[in-house]
């Protein structure tokens, strides 16, 4: 009899074998992790993550909890996440932290290193679990070696979270596909940024055609032309410093979508400090692209504003992992996810890979957390292929190194931020004169 991974009472007690589930998770996890060069790690993590379900106690537990055999006795400890972690450590002793930390925490969250070591030391591999042979060791070493050329010590915890994100989302998605096929069917492929660009182009052309020939509109057009001209630049850090009234929202969106098209990037994530601005920005985006193509993920989302029940369900599901072409969220949601250890928040991280991040009103980034925020953005740009666009009316100092007499005053910024609007444009003076 095959090892049970899931039982679906709604489908006449259908059983998903642990082999099918593990293979499904491995396939998805490998696909996600391949985006940043660690596909083999994703595959092995997926194959090992539920090895503990082979335990006799777990098989009894799942039969009882599902209702298949409600009166069956459970003999002993039925926890399972630690088993795959111990197997990973045994099979891959030198590189196991990039597997075992994700596996042992795939339900309860990532442990810090001390707690991880303590938890691992409490257990042994159960005798009723089969330990497979080690495979793909050389491939994993090669993947890690390529990344290590650019990694610094502070980058590794983000790499751990990213691998964790791949495993957690893959586990959720494969389980959902078996337990709730109707919901899973809503996760069909979304429209791409390439397909969305004509909508933006048409919208901007209509505005231009109807707009009177005024000084303000000429400045806005000038800003947009600069965004078009610089959008083909390499992935990296950019800033768009445009005073209020200069058309910053549409210009930044134009730059982001063209930059994404240039580099084959998958999505645009717009992070905004205030929910009032988010609602306004999202409304503009929906008028351009359609509400079905813009995901709002913040506390002020009004479900009643979405009349289509199917679309509402799709949006709720997409907010779990940000698998959407355009995401509008808060700074808090973005940075809490990047620095969290919880499955629900980390789940979306792998969908930030190869994305354009627009940080609106960059001057509002909290001073007390500015160093870890900047360090995180540098890691995501270097290791995970993102580009970051800071937009503001008055750009804060985020580049270079600032040294003070107090250690807390020391700030290591971004080496280079490419300003889209040259100083000679003097937009502040021009807009001040025409108001």
Regions found by a protein language model. Name each.
Residues 103, 234-259:
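Walker A/P-loop
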Residues 327, 331-335, 343-383, 388:
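SF2 helicase catalytic motif II
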Residues 290-339:
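Inter-Walker segment of RecA-like/P-loop motor cores
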Residues 15, 21, 28, 40, ...:
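Conserved pre-motif I regulatory segment
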Residues 2-203:
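Accessory nucleic-acid engagement/destabilization modules that flank
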Residues 251, 256-258, 264-289, 296-301, ...:
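Conserved Walker A/P-loop ATP-binding site and its immediately adjacent core
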Residues 394-435:
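Interdomain hinge/linker at the junction between the two RecA-like core domains of SF2 helicases
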Residues 233-240, 266-267, 323-324, 432:
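Pre-Walker A (Motif I) flank of P-loop NTPase domains
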């Amino acid at each position: 009899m095959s090892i049970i991974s899931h039982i679906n009472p709604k489908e006449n007690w259908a059983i998903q074998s642990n082999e099918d589930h593990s293979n499904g998770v491995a396939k998805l996890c490998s696909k996600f992790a391949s985006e940043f060069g660690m596909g083999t790690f994703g595959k092995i993590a997926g194959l090992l993550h539920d090895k503990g379900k082979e335990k006799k106690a777990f098989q009894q537990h799942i039969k009882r909890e599902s209702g298949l055999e409600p009166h069956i006795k459970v003999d002993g400890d039925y926890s399972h996440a630690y088993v795959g972690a111990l197997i990973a450590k045994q099979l891959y002793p030198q590189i196991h932290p990039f597997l075992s930390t994700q596996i042992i925490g795939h339900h309860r969250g990532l442990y810090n290193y001390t707690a991880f070591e303590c938890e691992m030391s409490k257990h042994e591999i159960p005798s009723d679990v089969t330990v497979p042979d080690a495979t793909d060791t050389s491939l994993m070493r090669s993947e890690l070696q390529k990344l290590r050329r650019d990694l610094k010590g502070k980058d590794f915890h983000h790499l751990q979270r990213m691998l964790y994100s791949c495993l957690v989302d893959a586990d959720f998605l494969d389980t959902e596909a078996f337990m709730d096929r109707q919901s899973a069917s809503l996760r069909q492929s979304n429209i791409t940024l390439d397909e969305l660009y004509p909508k933006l182009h048409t919208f901007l052309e209509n505005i231009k055609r109807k707009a009177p020939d005024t000084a303000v509109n000429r400045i806005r057009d000038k800003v947009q032309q600069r965004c078009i001209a610089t959008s083909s630049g390499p992935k990296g850090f950019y800033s768009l410093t445009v005073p209020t009234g200069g058309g910053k929202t549409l210009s930044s969106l134009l730059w982001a979508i063209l930059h994404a098209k240039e580099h084959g990037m998958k999505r645009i994530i717009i992070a905004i400090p205030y929910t009032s601005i988010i609602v306004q920005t999202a409304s503009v985006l929906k008028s351009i692209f359609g509400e079905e193509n813009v995901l709002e993920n913040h506390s002020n989302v009004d479900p009643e504003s979405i009349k289509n029940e199917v679309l509402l369900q799709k949006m709720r599901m997409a907010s779990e992992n940000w698998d959407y072409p355009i995401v509008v969220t808060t700074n808090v949601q973005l940075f809490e996810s990047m620095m969290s250890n919880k499955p629900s928040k980390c789940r979306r991280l792998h969908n930030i890979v190869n994305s354009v991040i627009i940080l609106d009103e960059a001057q509002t980034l909290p001073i007390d957390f500015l160093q870890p925020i900047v360090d995180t953005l540098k890691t995501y740009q270097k290791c995970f292929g993102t580009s970051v666009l800071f937009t503001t009316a008055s750009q804060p100092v985020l580049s270079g190194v600032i040294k003070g007499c107090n250690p807390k005053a020391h700030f290591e910024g971004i080496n280079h931020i490419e300003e889209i609007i040259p100083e000679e444009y003097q937009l502040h003076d021009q807009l001040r004169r025409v108001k």
